[in-house]
């Protein structure tokens, strides 16, 4: 436990998940649920009810889903350049990644299939935030002034990518 570590106790190493390319770093890692859940109850974090699966991403461009019970990878996906951020869509099997390849991608951890790629950045995407799509929009649909709520636009999730060129772009997962 953290308390044991704080008081000088030792942590027990359980496993080493070693599949990213040698010499490259793992940049981001998150717990993820394989089965969507809206049930209330104990959570292991802000995005997952279970602690049996994780997703890692690194500077090798690889995104790897891990089964912690089996101690091995269960699937892999790839960007063309270093992955800078991975964020799980809360309590779902979906996650999004940002990369130096100028793209934001959304994946399904069960199949590791890409279910969406967002373009528009002219440089690397350094950070990413995901939130529930509440239908609030500001931009082209509203003439760039004010915000409005259109309940027909509730799509599930929207996310914001922070680009190295000094711009943040907002996307809706359709």
Regions found by a protein language model. Name each.
Residues 37, 62-64, 69-70, 74, ...:
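Eukaryotic modular interaction domains in large regulatory/scaffold proteins
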């Amino acid at each position: 436990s953290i308390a044991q570590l704080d008081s000088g106790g030792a942590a027990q190493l359980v496993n080493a998940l070693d599949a990213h390319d040698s010499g490259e770093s793992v940049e981001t890692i998150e717990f993820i649920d394989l089965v969507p859940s809206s049930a209330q109850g104990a959570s292991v974090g802000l995005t997952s009810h279970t602690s049996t699966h994780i997703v890692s991403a690194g500077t090798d461009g690889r995104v790897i889903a891990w089964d912690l019970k089996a101690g091995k990878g269960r699937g892999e996906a790839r960007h063309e350049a270093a992955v800078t951020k991975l964020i799980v869509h809360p309590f779902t099997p979906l996650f999004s990644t940002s990369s130096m390849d100028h793209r934001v991608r959304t994946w399904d951890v069960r199949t590791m299939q890409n279910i969406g790629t967002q373009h528009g950045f002219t440089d690397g995407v350094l950070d990413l935030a995901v939130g529930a799509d509440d239908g609030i929009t500001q931009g082209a649909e509203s003439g760039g002034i004010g915000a409005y709520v259109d309940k027909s636009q509730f799509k599930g999730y929207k996310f914001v990518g922070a680009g190295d060129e000094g711009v943040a772009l907002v996307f809706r997962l359709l």
